[in-house]
Amino acid sequence: MTIDDIIRPIVKEFKAYVPGKSKEEIARNYGISIEKIIKLGSNENPWGCSPKIKEALLLELSKLHQYPEPLNSELLGEISSFIGVPCENIIIGGDGADEVIDNIMRILIDEGDEVIIPIPTFTQYAISAKIHGAKIKWAKFDKEKDFKLDVESVLNNITEKTKAIFLCTPNNPTGNVISNEDIKKIIESTDALIMIDHAYIEYSKKEYDLTQWALKYDNVLVLRTFSKVFGLAGQRIGYGVTNKKIVDYMMRIKPIFSLTRASQVSAITALKDKEFFNGCKINGIRSITQLHDGLKKFKQLKVYPTETNYLLVEIKNGMNSKEFCEILLKKGVIVRDCYSFEGLEPYYFRVSIGTFEENERFLEIMSEIIE
């Protein structure tokens, strides 16, 4: 018997996740000084995290030999105040929202259960569902309507075997929100768990924030993260908001110390620094407007509307996104080609906000390439 013989067959079907490229990788591969590389590929906060976090981490260094506080009590309290939800309705993940996604699949899915996922969307949903034995039923965001959710494609896939439905809003990579009316229609049509991924909700209009619906409906779980506006992508902190019973079941199987001491302190400090948070929201909206207005000037591109810190862009001159992104990489600009997103043709790339100076330089380089 070989190693291949003892590996689960479902694992062999997967391809390794391809993340956005790092500055270090581009510097090595293209011989470009890391200081000159503009990273606009991973939907990060270009202004970083609160400067107060660095001070808090220095104070925490003397405690790194101790395990973190297992119940995350102080952090739960700060999150509770931030979103207006009781602590008992919050579950924290130490690998970002990915941990919450994986743990909810662990408590829900038996072999043969069904999960509905509209595409194109975040790829981790399907990976977590499949590895736990789920059958994926694909719904769709309609390209002909600027990727508006085709709600009937979701409703028509619901069966007695449906255990969960993933709704990413605002959606990654398309940037648009799902209407509250459509989400309500889906929630009220099934007892399956509706996973509302709000990773980018801080950039959206307030009326699209459905976090409170996790208290209103028993079959709703809302995902949130510290990776975007809070600038803590490197610390991998996410959380879910749902009913107390689901939190209890997830607490039974989640890793005990998955959130490090450094991550706890970082998240607590970030939530307390409201001035920095609000500044990042304002600058993020200004930055995406700068990018949107600049890219709209190129007739060879279709720029889709967004409620996030990134734009989905379609190349209309016949060049595929891999070729286009390779040209940008050689000039020191990282954007994300969308080949890995199920349901998208090979002519799309995603570009996320930079500082205003980075955006300006990116648009200059785009002019050199396109015109």
From Swiss-Prot:
One of its GO terms (molecular function) is histidinol-phosphate transaminase activity. The modification N6-(pyridoxal phosphate)lysine is found at residue 228. SUPFAM superfamilies: PLP-dependent transferases (SSF53383). It catalyses: L-histidinol phosphate + 2-oxoglutarate = 3-(imidazol-4-yl)-2-oxopropyl phosphate + L-glutamate. The keyword Aminoacyl-tRNA synthetase does not apply. Its EC number is 2.6.1.9. GO terms for biological process: L-histidine biosynthetic process. Its cofactor is pyridoxal 5'-phosphate. Keywords: Amino-acid biosynthesis, Aminotransferase, Histidine biosynthesis, Pyridoxal phosphate, Transferase. Gene3D superfamilies: Aspartate Aminotransferase, domain 1, Type I PLP-dependent aspartate aminotransferase-like (Major domain). It comes from the Archaea. InterPro entries: Aminotransferase_I/II_large, HisP_aminotrans, PyrdxlP-dep_Trfase, PyrdxlP-dep_Trfase_major, PyrdxlP-dep_Trfase_small. The keyword Transferase applies. Pathway: Amino-acid biosynthesis; L-histidine biosynthesis; L-histidine from 5-phospho-alpha-D-ribose 1-diphosphate: step 7/9. Belongs to the class-II pyridoxal-phosphate-dependent aminotransferase family. Histidinol-phosphate aminotransferase subfamily. This is Histidinol-phosphate aminotransferase. It comes from Methanococcus vannielii (strain ATCC 35089 / DSM 1224 / JCM 13029 / OCM 148 / SB). The lineage of its organism: Archaea, Methanobacteriati, Methanobacteriota, Methanomada group, Methanococci. The gene is hisC.
